[in-house]
Regions:
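Conserved, structured core segments of small domains
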Residues: 1-85
Length: 85
């Protein structure tokens, strides 16, 4: 199933020490086909992911591999979506 995930970071100043590992894990998730697309808003600390997972819990588990998420620095809300094309 496909999901749209909205991630918000309440304290972006705390992200810096984890950027390298975050980038590595994101690349892994993309290579595994979990993260299909990643977008960032330019004016706010918000990211959007398009994911493919078995269900919402699987998506949470996969996104939970990200250091920002593990450290509580980025929180996601997940919504199942239907692929039209």
């Amino acid at each position: 199933m496909y999901l749209h995930a909205t991630g918000i970071s309440p304290d972006v100043e705390k992200l810096a020490p984890y950027w390298e590992e975050e980038s590595r894990v994101l690349a892994e998730l993309h290579a595994e086909g979990v993260v299909k697309s990643l977008f960032r808003l330019n004016d706010r600390p918000v990211v959007y992911l398009i994911l493919e997972a078995d269900d919402v819990e699987d998506a949470r588990k996969q996104v939970g591999r990200l250091p920002f998420v593990r450290k509580g620095l980025l929180r996601f809300e997940f919504e199942p979506v239907e692929k039209l094309i």
